[in-house]
Curated annotation (Swiss-Prot):
It catalyses: N-acetyl-L-glutamate + ATP = N-acetyl-L-glutamyl 5-phosphate + ADP. Keywords: Amino-acid biosynthesis, Arginine biosynthesis, ATP-binding, Cytoplasm, Kinase, Nucleotide-binding, Transferase. SUPFAM superfamilies: Carbamate kinase-like. This is Acetylglutamate kinase. The gene is argB. One of its GO terms (biological process) is L-arginine biosynthetic process. HAMAP family: ArgB. Catalyzes the ATP-dependent phosphorylation of N-acetyl-L-glutamate.
Amino acid sequence: METSMETVIKKAEILIEALPYIQKLYGKTVVIKYGGNAMINEELKTSVMEDITLLKYIGMNPVVVHGGGPDINKALDKFNIKSRFINGLRLTDKATMDVAQMVLVGKTNKEIVSILNQMGGKAVGICGIDGNVIECEQYKTTIDGQETDLGYVGKITNINSKLIELLAKDEYIPVIAPIGIGKDGQSYNINADTVAGEIAAALKAEKLMLLTDVPGVKKNKDSDEIIPALTSAEALELINKKIIDGGMIPKVLGCIEALEKGVGRTHIIDGRIPHCLLLEIFTNKGIGTMIMKEKILYYEGEKL
C-alpha cells in the first residue's frame, strides 16, 4: 500500500515539475519536425501523436512538419523507380516527384491527420502548395566545381504563414507536407528539416523540435553522454572541432539559423524514446540537446 502511495506521490511531483513550463509556453507555438523511426514504429507513432494532442489541450499551438522517406522509398520500389542521392538530397526527376507528392500529401499526411483526430485533436493536413504557404525555386548545388540542380528539389524563397497561424491559433493542429510551389506552378520536394526551421522562423515559434534517430549532441565521439544545452556559439565550436559531424551538422546549423530568425529555443531529440516531446519540454533536464542563442532560464529550477 505504501509503495502504491509513493508511486502516486511521484506522479504528482512529475506533474508539478511540468507546471512552470506549461505556464511559460501557454499560447506559444511549437513546431515539430516529425520523422525518422518514430514514423515507422507503431508504438512510437502513437506516443508522438498523444504528446502532440496533449500539447494542444494544455494551451500550446503545435505545428507538425513531417518527412516521409520510408513511404516514398516503398512507393518508388513498387513503380520500379530507382533513387539516387547527392549530398544527402534525393535526385528527383519528374517520375520521382510525382510519386513523392502523391505519397507525402495523399498518404503520409492524411495518416498523421487521421491518428491525431482519433485521439481527440482537430488536425488539418496541408502542403506548401495550399495557399502558396511554401514558395520556392529550384535548388542548386555544386558538384566537382560545377553548379547543378537535383531535378525537382526546392529551395525555400518565402513562407506565407497566415494560413498556418489561422489554424494553429484556433482549435486546429496544422500538419504540413514538405512540398513547395515555384513561380511557374511547378511543385518541388523540400527537405523536411529545412521546412520546419523556416516555418518556425516565420511563426516566431517559441520552440522548434527535431525528432531524429540519435539521442542528441554528444560530448565527444567516444562518449554516450549527451550535452543537454548549448548556445549557438558553443555548437559552432563543436562543429569546428569535428565533434559534431556528418548528418548532425545540417540539423545543428538549421537550428542556429532558426534562432537567428527569432525562434526561442531549438531541440534535437531522440524520436525513438516514447513520449520524447513531453520528456524534453516538461522536465528540468530533458532528454536531448537544446540549442539557444544564450543560456537564459525559463525559471530558477531549470537545469541547463
